[in-house]
């Protein structure tokens, strides 16, 4: 492409260097893709899986550790995630189910974890995400499990009790809610459509700026954006991705009450299609347990972790549906069952529990 006249010679020279580097990068990327295809052929012969989250976590950690700059490590991870996603897609398409429609934070989490070279399968509910991953319609499901403002996603935790799926990864997003509308103004809004959690997370802003406007719960923020795209009297609370998807203006950005609002997602799959990840060196093990209702039972449950020096990073309780005032406890611990101290602690914990289920072991979020 011809450069405009009057451009400084130094700038022209630098642009030429950048063009040359880009061509070198393209050649190297294609060389990497060729090697990935060779790896894929070996995996097919051996019956191995294409996606290995612990391997990708180790690659990204290694690159961050040797990065000389000036490129920041926060940029290294998404760049290589897209490279690995594109190479993985050459071996086999990755089908990922998530809470839809297009433009949800669940879709953003799926793209952030797997990269953009995937087959997207938006679902109408969390239950449908689980069903898609269980039935084989999807290779993986993306499940919201916890929000820093609103707490746990109860339906997801309840489904983990009985599902055959297990967790092979996690990712989290900083959630920025925006007020979206077909018309770029606050006046004349009759109702605000959003997921109940989004409405709760923006309560103070809505009460201050739009106190008399109806708050209308819908299945997802993206569904609210879709409805707002059809009716200029409606507004939605959703992501900037949703604003682009449905042709809406960002009337007011970042209206969430907590500027550090973050949602955590679990990546789930079926054991018949994907083995549990091997130890990566920076792992988390999630489990759900229950104990008999007796004095000191919860204390006894935690003693094995303390005695073996296993750190607990999450502890949530959910009432059982037995009607007997019993509870399930959802626990995250640092480490992998292949580590002797973690293995010993989990064996002792299992012995004191009435119910014990490992939900998954996976690399700690590097995304």
Model-derived features with residue positions:
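Domain-level signature for soluble enzymes in the chorismate/prephenate branch of the shikimate pathway
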Residues: 1-367
């Amino acid at each position: 492409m011809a450069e405009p006249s009057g451009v400084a010679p130094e700038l022209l020279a630098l642009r030429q260097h950048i063009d040359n580097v880009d061509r070198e990068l393209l050649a190297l990327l294609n060389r990497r893709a060729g090697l990935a295809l060779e790896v894929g052929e070996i995996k097919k012969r051996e019956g191995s899986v294409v996606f290995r989250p612990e391997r990708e976590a180790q690659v990204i950690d290694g690159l961050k550790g040797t990065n000389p700059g000036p490129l920041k490590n926060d940029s290294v991870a998404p760049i290589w995630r897209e490279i690995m996603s594109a190479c993985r897609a050459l071996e086999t398409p990755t089908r990922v189910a998530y809470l839809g429609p297009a433009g949800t934070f669940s879709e953003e989490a799926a793209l952030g974890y797997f990269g953009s070279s995937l087959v997207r399968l938006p679902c109408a509910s969390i239950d449908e995400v689980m069903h898609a991953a269980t039935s084989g319609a999807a290779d993986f499901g993306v499940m919201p499990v916890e929000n820093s403002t609103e707490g746990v996603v109860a339906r997801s935790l309840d489904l983990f009790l009985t599902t055959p799926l297990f967790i092979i990864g996690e990712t989290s997003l900083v959630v920025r809610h925006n007020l979206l509308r077909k018309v770029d103004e606050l006046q004349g809004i009759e109702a605000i459509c959003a997921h109940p959690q989004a409405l709760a997370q923006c309560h103070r802003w809505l009460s201050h700026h739009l106190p008399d406007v109806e708050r209308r719960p819908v299945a997802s923020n993206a569904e609210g954006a879709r409805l707002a795209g059809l009716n200029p009297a409606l507004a939605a609370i959703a992501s900037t991705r949703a604003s682009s998807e449905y042709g809406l203006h960002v009337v007011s950005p970042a209206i969430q009450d907590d500027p550090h609002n973050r949602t955590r997602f679990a990546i789930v799959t079926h054991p018949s299609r994907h083995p549990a990840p091997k130890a990566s060196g920076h792992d988390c093990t999630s489990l759900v347990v229950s104990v008999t209702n007796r004095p000191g039972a919860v204390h006894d449950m935690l003693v094995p972790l303390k005695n073996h020096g296993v750190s607990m990073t999450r502890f949530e309780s959910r009432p059982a549906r037995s009607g007997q005032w019993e509870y399930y406890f959802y626990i995250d611990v640092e480490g992998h069952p292949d580590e002797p101290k973690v293995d010993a602690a989990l064996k002792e914990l299992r012995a004191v529990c009435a119910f014990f289920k490992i939900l998954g072991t996976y690399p700690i979020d590097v995304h």
